[in-house]
Amino acid sequence: TDVPESADWYNSSYIIAWGSNVPQTRTPDAHFFTEVRYKGTKTIAITPDYSEVAKLCDQWLAPKQGTDSALAMAMGHVILKRFHLDNPSDYFLNYCRHYTDMPMLVLLDDRDDGTTVPGRMVRASDLLDGLGESNNPQWKTVAFSTAGELVAPNGSIGFRWGEKGKWNLEQRAAGQETELTLSLLDLKDEVAAVGFPYFGGNENPHFRSVPQQPVLIHRLPAKRLTLASGESRLVVSVYDLVLANYGLDRGLDDENAAGDFSEVKAYTPAWAEQITGVPRHHIEQIAWEFADTAHKTHGRSMIILGAGVNHWYHMDMN
């Protein structure tokens, strides 16, 4: 398991104990979990059984065993819709720009059926003159600035060898301050049909499946680049790939995207309710509270992840 240090639990304003039975498996640390509630921190237990940690929490969600990933995907769907699309959180968006690969560009690979799939990252070496990057351009990822220019922001792996003092992730390129673009929605040249694998329809003796196509085609804003080789390729941002994978409607005529939480499409709360057994309004509530607290406190929401969710295949992918 990989969780915030127990002494840091007291700094949190919202804690989810996900598959971690703190009083039983972390007895010496359990007092931090109970004491933090005295300052108003809300605690949530996510575990199929009413374990010891559930009695220490304000609310208990009981997904069917092995369905934690479905619950997590639905919570992510709610958070992305509420805090990235409906009412964008400056704190969340700035965090994504500074500390994640979400602004980076990904090449789309063509399929025989006319659709595409995500390929590898775009590198500075793919572009004419390598964006002026002479040191390790094959290892430097690329993004668009808000001015619509291609840049190689500081901090990717290519900056960590041969260039002193460029280890930190920064919104800088060629020595200049720059703000990175997360989505290509306003810069797009065309809308690409991109395939994503779907595993929620696989039959399982322990919980219900929700049959859909094994490959879900989503429509993403894409930009066409001419590479140094002369080849013309479509690229998308990691951010747009994430939003599409979570099934969020971007107004691009995407029939597999959901515009409402009540639609039974991957990965809405209504979809997750059928698989996990957790009422969708509880999924919406906990996801919103967790993210809203993080938004207002600049990150004081924590998840204590227990080994219990790893006892099923792929549960460590939450």
Predicted segments, located by residue:
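Anionic-ligand anchoring segments at beta-strand to alpha-helix junctions in alpha/beta enzyme folds, i.e.
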Residues: T1-N11
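Short, polar loop motifs at secondary-structure junctions
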Residues: I46-E52
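Short acidic, glycine-rich surface-loop motifs adjacent to enzyme active sites
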Residues: N11-P23
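Acidic catalytic cores of enzymes that act on phosphate-bearing nucleotides/polynucleotides
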Residues: H282-Q285, A291-N318
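A short helix->loop->beta-strand "cap" motif at the edges of active sites that frequently abuts
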Residues: E35-T43
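Glycine/threonine-rich flexible loop motifs
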Residues: V22-F33
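Long, well-ordered, tryptophan-enriched scaffold segments
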Residues: A54-K55, Q59-K296
